[in-house]
């Protein structure tokens, strides 16, 4: 019993008890304003919201004063809702919108404090240096290239959501024991739920609590995913242990789990009693890998198809009993790696089988041996990228380039810079593709879309404009890309474009997915 309880309580001893007073500290809202609204890559530019740094200090002081007042959040939501639909009293709506945004950002910053401190202390205790290169998205592909070639089956998992808000608060309660702060967070989430329901019934888009509160709800979602992955690792470790014990010891271990009654999470005890003993016995897999990305997960195994089906139903039962989430079977697809291609982080990944014959010579006899080697392959999903370009209005659905009218008012240098930056970012992100023909097609679409945009601005035809521009437009799209590649792979010979057709390059400076990849 000490083993399980110690595992569940691991890293949970440093709970923060006094987070609620931070809501009344001015510097918290300054951090929320600077990092959340003015400097983060996840948020819209500050000019969208209609305020700047000059007015932030006054508004923060006014916000702190109003927080002390009773029923502030109720009036805040009501004012935002009324002004959103009525359309008058712009100042009241602005203050309500700003206050709701700042409270949400401050909630996110405050709840991140104990987890950030725990992460820093973990690195200090383990004496682990901070390898920023491991944050790169591309760092996962060499891992998959090394591991997936030895596996047989892969399960595509769509993580169920949305989860009930009370479950989210209970998850945080295991880490944070500040009762007033949790009550206020619960009230804030319920007010968001009421506003969400109201806006849906009136067929309006969610404005106040959707686009601007990404940080808080991203944190809540990550805490939810971390909780079920935390218990998944525990079950995985127990299943590994079961391979080394006899059936009699295993039955005693089941009885041991059923006796646990003094854990902090009582609903987890119910899970242990009702279904834990039914899952541990079949979760025996000596070679399994798990990768999560963008609300999805991949579970690859060397086991049989029957084992993967057992893991599938294990996930269904686990989500239902522990998180009270009803998941449908279509959320998990089991496929054989040798006959399956899956879309992963902007790449179409698959496992290629290469047949080769090896001549073996033994004394006077020689014979051929057919060998099969597996190779993890990644290519550019051209259809998905064209669909993303079509959504961004760079081309039609069929891939025919069109002009970008909203950029026609910019200067020529700004238009060239924007198109060139998009083209270089796509080439940079998809540099790990084994086939570069798809990238050339995407570059052609962007290059011609840029030419059409410039021709539209100057009220000319594309042919006339390109004849006047010459090869300058082509150089604009390729110059900086060559410099980046030559820095990573210095050569004595100049960079030749067709050489990159055969090279797969993984960069260690990519920390977010390209926006066009997200559209797909």
Swiss-Prot record:
Pfam families: Intron_maturas2, MatK_N. It is found in: Plastid, Chloroplast. One of its GO terms (biological process) is mRNA processing. Keywords: Chloroplast, mRNA processing, Plastid, RNA-binding, tRNA processing. Signal peptide: none annotated. The keyword Membrane does not apply. GO terms for molecular function: RNA binding. Usually encoded in the trnK tRNA gene intron. Probably assists in splicing its own and other chloroplast group II introns. This is Maturase K. It comes from Maianthemum dilatatum (False lily-of-the-valley).
């Amino acid at each position: 019993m000490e083993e399980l309880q110690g595992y569940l309580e691991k890293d949970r001893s440093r709970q923060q008890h006094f987070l609620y007073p931070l809501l009344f500290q001015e510097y918290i809202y300054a951090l929320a304003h600077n990092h959340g609204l003015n400097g983060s890559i996840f948020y819209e530019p500050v000019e969208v919201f209609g305020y700047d740094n000059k007015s932030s200090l006054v508004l923060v002081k006014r916000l702190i004063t109003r927080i002390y007042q009773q029923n502030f959040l109720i009036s805040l939501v009501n004012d935002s809702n009324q002004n959103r639909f009525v359309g008058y009293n712009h100042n009241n709506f602005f203050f309500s919108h700003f206050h709701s945004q700042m409270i949400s950002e401050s909630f996110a910053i405050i709840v991140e404090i104990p987890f950030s401190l725990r992460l820093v202390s973990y690195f200090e205790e383990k004496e682990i240096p901070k390898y920023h290169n491991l944050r790169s998205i591309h760092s996962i592909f060499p891992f998959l290239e090394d591991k997936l070639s030895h596996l047989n089956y892969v399960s595509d998992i769509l993580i169920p959501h949305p989860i009930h808000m009370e479950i989210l608060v209970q998850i945080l309660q295991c880490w944070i024991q500040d009762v007033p702060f949790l009550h206020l967070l619960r009230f804030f989430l319920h007010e968001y739920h009421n506003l969400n329901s109201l806006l849906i019934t009136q067929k309006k888009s969610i404005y106040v609590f959707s686009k601007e509160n990404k940080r808080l709800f991203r944190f809540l979602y990550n805490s939810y995913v971390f909780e079920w992955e935390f218990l998944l690792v525990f079950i995985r470790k127990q299943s590994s242990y079961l391979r080394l014990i006899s059936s009699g010891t295993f039955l005693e271990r089941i009885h041991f789990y059923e006796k646990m009654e003094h854990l902090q999470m009582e609903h987890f005890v119910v899970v242990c009693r009702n279904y834990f003993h039914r899952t541990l016995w079949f979760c025996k897999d000596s070679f399994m890998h798990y990768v999560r990305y963008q609300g999805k997960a991949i579970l690859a195994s060397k086991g049989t198809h029957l084992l993967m089906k057992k893991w599938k139903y294990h996930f269904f039962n686990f989500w239902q009993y522990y998180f009270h989430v009803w998941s449908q079977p279509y959320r998990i697809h089991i496929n054989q790696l040798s006959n399956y291609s899956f879309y992963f982080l902007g790449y179409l990944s698959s496992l290629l089988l290469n047949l080769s014959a090896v001549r073996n010579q033994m004394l006077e006899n020689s014979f051929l041996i057919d060998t099969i080697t597996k190779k993890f392959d990644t290519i550019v999903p051209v259809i998905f990228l064209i669909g993303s370009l079509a959504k961004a209005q760079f081309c039609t659905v069929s891939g025919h380039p069109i002009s970008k009218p909203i950029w026609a008012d910019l200067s020529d240098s700004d238009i060239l810079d924007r198109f060139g930056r998009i083209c270089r970012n796509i080439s940079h992100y998809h540099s790990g593709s084994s086939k570069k023909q798809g990238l050339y097609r995407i570059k052609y679409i962007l290059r011609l879309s840029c030419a059409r945009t410039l021709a539209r601005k100057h009220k000319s035809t594309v042919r006339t404009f390109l004849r006047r521009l010459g090869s300058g437009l082509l150089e604009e799209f390729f110059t900086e890309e060559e410099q980046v590649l030559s820095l990573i792979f210095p050569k004595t010979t100049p960079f030749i474009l067709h050489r990159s057709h055969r090279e797969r390059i993984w960069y260690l400076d990519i920390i977010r997915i390209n926006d066009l990849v997200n559209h797909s």
